[in-house]
Amino acid sequence: MSTRKAQHGARQDTEYGARQGTEQGARRSAQRGALGRYGESLAARRLTESGMTVLERNWRGGRTGEIDIVARDGDALVVCEVKTRRAGLFEHPMAAITPAKAERLRGLAERWVQEHGGAPPGGVRIDLVGILLPDRGAPVVEHVRGVA
């Protein structure tokens, strides 16, 4: 990669170097997207196996964000956040629900309910499905109900 000297002797990437970095970033982004879709498929399967009905996946609430899975559990509506991680690289997926994230999910759930005819008799619950992908072996799927 070619570089040139900037003021104060620091190295600065030229156009080729910046483009190369962008291509690497795009590849990583595509890999993260594929990982997320795989995790969401595993989560939807787990929810279905536990008796829930998946109503929607990847519902977008305008610019405020996205609900990974909207499901029905009896007479309750479930807004489900899915976090998928490779083992050892990042924090555990269950650490993903911060107070700010919980508040955003509550707002998205409220918007979904408004757009779909009101709250069901069983209310609305926010769940988390955390998926840990080990280097070898089967994925570990954890479902925690009522996280926020």
Curated annotation (Swiss-Prot):
Residues 1-35 are annotated as: Disordered. It holds the Pfam family UPF0102. InterPro entries: Restrct_endonuc-II-like (IPR011335), tRNA_endonuc-like_dom_sf (IPR011856), UPF0102_YraN-like (IPR003509). GO terms for molecular function: nucleic acid binding. It comes from the Bacteria. NCBIfam families: PRK12497.3-3 (NF009154). Belongs to the UPF0102 family. This is UPF0102 protein SAV_2633/SAV2633. It comes from Streptomyces avermitilis (strain ATCC 31267 / DSM 46492 / JCM 5070 / NBRC 14893 / NCIMB 12804 / NRRL 8165 / MA-4680).
